[in-house]
A protein has these predicted regions:
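Terminal accessory regions of large proteins
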Residues: 1-198
């Protein structure tokens, strides 16, 4: 359906890291998966305790910058980006864009991650209320605060993206990346920043 979610934690099997691992398994075999992930993580050199975390952080923070630079500010992968809290990010391939893309991203992916955050906030509160360990309570409190910021960011983003989804904006590939990139973020003459800046 032309949408790959990028999450800061492993919430879905079909997020970008899950799909990347599935691709590595298919191409190089399951026996060498961890070795290949370690090799890639070492090459990326990002932050993270495990190779999957390093790869996740790369996709979350650096992939789109590298992609925009490689394609000289005319990216073929567009990043839906809710903001600094990394509440919602998803890649789409511009050549598969259609009038329902924004609506699909909103309903199938944005609302899905919002439900995950709501459940995680409840789970963190249960840990805070029931744990006897200060370290666990402190960790759950910190995570809950982060999740609350992310849910707020995604709800603010949802308000922007909803209007654009109702507009059912299609693109014309002949107009080029820059024109279409602006077009899909504009409704009724007003630009709403829903994609990463290029």
């Amino acid at each position: 359906d032309n949408c790959i979610p990028i999450t800061d934690e492993e919430y879905f099997e079909d997020d970008i890291v899950g799909l990347f691992c599935a691709w590595l398994k298919k191409v190089y075999g399951e026996d060498t998966l961890e070795e290949n992930l370690d090799f890639i993580a070492n090459a990326l050199g990002n932050k993270g305790k495990t190779s999957r975390e390093v790869i996740r952080n790369y996709f979350l923070k650096d992939f789109i910058k590298d992609h925009i630079k490689t394609y000289q500010k005319r990216p073929i992968y567009w990043l839906f980006d809710s903001g600094k809290q990394n509440g919602f990010k998803a890649l789409i391939y511009m050549h598969r864009w259609n009038a329902d893309t924004i609506g699909n991203v909103r309903v199938e992916y944005l609302h899905r991650i919002q439900r995950v955050y709501e459940k995680e906030i409840i789970r963190m509160q249960e840990i805070i209320d029931n744990s006897h360990y200060n370290k666990e309570i402190s960790s759950a409190t910190k995570r809950k605060e982060k999740l609350q910021k992310q849910i707020k960011e995604t709800k603010d983003y949802d308000a922007k993206i909803a209007h654009l989804a109702l507009s059912r904006i299609d693109i014309d590939l002949d107009d080029g990346v820059k024109v279409n990139y602006e077009k899909v973020q504009t409704a009724d003459g007003k630009k709403m920043q829903i994609l990463a800046k290029i």
